[in-house]
Amino acid sequence: MAKSPSLKIKGLKLNNQANITEVDCALVGAGIMSTTLGVFLKEIHPDLSIQMIETLPGEAQESSNSWNNAGTGHAANCELNYTPLEADGTVNISKALEVNVEFDLSRQLWSYLTKKGAIKTPSAFINPVPHMSFVEGDAHVSFLKKRHTALSAHHCFRGMEYTEDQAQIAQWAPLVIKGRNPSEKVAATRIITGADVSYGSLTSILLNYLKSLPGFSASFQDEVTAVDREADGRWCLTIKNRQTDHKRFVKAKFVFLGAGGGALPLLQKSGIPESEGYAGFPVSGIWLRCDSQEIASQHEAKVYGMASVGSPPMSVPHLDT
């Protein structure tokens, strides 16, 4: 009698292939990272088989959710951490140029998908909104002026405006100036070609497109509990359904861990050398939401301030539309 196929995972031998799925690629997490990569892969290699595995009931429910990030189309228009002040007093814009080009590449991808019909309504996830930088105090004003001079000379940032006039800033972003001392030293830059991006909406759009393609599948409320390398070089993911406790396995040639905070433990379980030297730590902050249309209607911009010396970039105060 012929033996049934078997799979051995760390001492566990399975003789039933019914709960084993073999694919080319496994995407862990159903956020903007996994959906974008999935689209890339299917556009380049349409014949690839891809399975997406998500722990939560739906896509984009954590970091990609529109209320869990600033929704800024990061093009270095207003993010001051991309333009550090050097020891010689000059502003280094090399990182800003790199980030600007990267966002332009994202827009090119979205434009391509729109022309193809994969994205039906671009305004469902991306819309124009001015990007502003706002600073206080003589030293920061001096820095912002140098930054504007350096950036506005480059075609990527053509049209960027600069002012130290509170009245002008009040026209751009009245809530930022309201209640301030008129004699306070402030400055702002503005570029009207900035973008607001709903990464949550974009994730859903991309996932719906992927679902329409042959060879793609997605499962939800499925948690990856183990990542093991097999003798043939493929990866075996152990997956447990959070509702039924049903266990199954996915074998893939390529695995992408796009699971946000859950990616690090899975990376460590893989045992690859690159998993060494990483750690996760909690970052707290205050994210305030205003549902009053009377107040929200007075603000139409993404205004980024300057982080304190020694503080991480995510500590930058900003007021977003």
Where are these regions (language model features)?
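Central beta-strand plus flanking loop segment that forms part of the substrate or channel wall
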Residues: 75-77, 274-302
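Flavin (primarily FAD) binding-site architecture
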Residues: 257-272
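Glycine-rich FAD pyrophosphate-binding loop
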Residues: 43-66
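N-terminal Rossmann-like FAD-binding beta1-loop-alpha1 element of flavoenzymes
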Residues: 23-51
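Helical element adjacent to the flavin cofactor pocket in flavoenzyme catalytic cores
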Residues: 188-254
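Extreme N-terminal leader/targeting segments of oxidoreductases
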Residues: 1-25, 43-47
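Dinucleotide-binding Rossmann-like beta1-alpha1 core, especially the glycine-rich loop
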Residues: 71-171
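Helix-loop-beta segment of a Rossmann-like dinucleotide-binding subdomain
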Residues: 20, 121-134, 171-213
